[in-house]
Curated annotation (Swiss-Prot):
Function, as annotated: Produces ATP from ADP in the presence of a proton gradient across the membrane. The gamma chain is believed to be important in regulating ATPase activity and the flow of protons through the CF(0) complex.
SUPFAM superfamilies: ATP synthase (F1-ATPase), gamma subunit
Domain of life: Bacteria
Name used for this protein in its record: ATP synthase gamma chain
UniProt-listed CDD domains: F1-ATPase_gamma
Keyword Membrane tagged: yes
InterPro entries, per database record: ATP_synth_F1_ATPase_gsu, ATP_synth_F1_gsu
GO molecular function, one term: ATP binding
């Protein structure tokens, strides 16, 4: 058992840490609410764009590159990580999944290109001497479409130029406050479901100019929207996991404070008992 001074010092430092983690928990909770609201507000836009694609692509046998599968000679991996830690296993889970999938496919560095969001992911691959084709650090906690536009444009350009034949996004999918799932989903080429699962409310309309020209405009916009919507979802997951991590840290700190307080009281009681014993012993010796 440590001295009273040591125990008291630990109690004070733990209380300060507890205050910090509680504050971070509250901040993460506020950011989570905003992230969920942003994601919900963006969904109607994607639904309308989905309907437009359904109406156009559903009435034509389009050979648009974004709708046609081709032999995969090189894959694109768009990895969404965070710019800072203290979010539990948020980064470790998704980065481990990327490496695992690459290894299971037996891919060499020449078989894929990495696009990485977040400093943690960028440093992760850099420390392993794995080349990153495009890096986007400092992603805002509440990203706007403009703030992530560089990476969406880069991903689409790589696909349209034939530098990659498939684009996959790796992210932590937000399920609820207590659960997130490391997820990989293919974005390009768009699946038949992506091109035909809308409501098709514009199917009775005539389109000007021709449908292929319209697809050339709205398909890239739709892919940009898919990427942006995924980033919004990943941000919600990040805030939720950080909120949970900080709550757990606060709970652990409270438990530690209780244990240290018990140790302090016992040590103080032992010291008092020792002093009384010494006084009694001294008095007895004087008799």
């Amino acid at each position: 058992m440590g001295s009273l001074k040591d125990i008291d010092s630990r109690i004070k430092s733990t209380k300060k840490m507890n205050q910090i983690t509680k504050a971070m928990n509250m901040v993460a909770s506020s950011k989570l609410n905003k992230a969920q609201r942003n994601s919900n507000q963006f969904k109607p836009y994607m639904d309308k764009l989905q309907n437009a694609i359904t109406a156009v692509a559903g009435q034509t046998t389009s050979n648009h590159p974004m709708l046609v599968e081709r032999p995969v000679k090189k894959r694109g991996y768009l990895v969404i990580s965070s710019d800072r830690g203290l979010a539990g296993a948020y980064n470790a889970n998704i980065l481990r999944k990327v490496l695992q999938d690459i290894q299971e496919r037996g891919e060499n560095p020449s078989d894929y290109k990495l696009l990485v969001l977040g400093k943690v992911g960028i440093d992760f691959f850099k420390n392993r001497s794995i080349e990153v084709e495009y890096a986007l650090p400092d992603v805002p906690d509440q990203p706007t479409f403009k703030s992530i536009e560089p990476v969406t444009k880069k991903a689409i350009d790589l696909y349209e130029n034939g530098d990659i034949d498939e684009l996959n996004i790796y992210y932590n999918k937000f399920i609820n406050v207590l659960e997130s799932k490391p997820t990989a989903k293919r974005v390009l080429p768009l699946s038949k479901e992506d091109a035909s699962s809308g409501l098709g409310q514009m199917s009775s309309y005539e389109f000007e100019p021709d449908k292929e020209s319209i697809l050339n405009i709205i398909l890239p916009q739709y892919v940009e929207g898919l990427i942006y919507g995924t980033i919004l979802n990943a941000k919600a997951s990040e805030h939720a996991m950080r909120m949970t991590a900080m709550k757990n840290a606060s709970d652990n700190a409270s438990d530690l404070i209780d244990d240290l307080s018990l140790q302090y009281n016992r040590a103080r009681q032992a010291a008092i008992t020792q002093q009384i014993t010494e006084i009694v012993g001294g008095a007895t010796a004087l008799e």
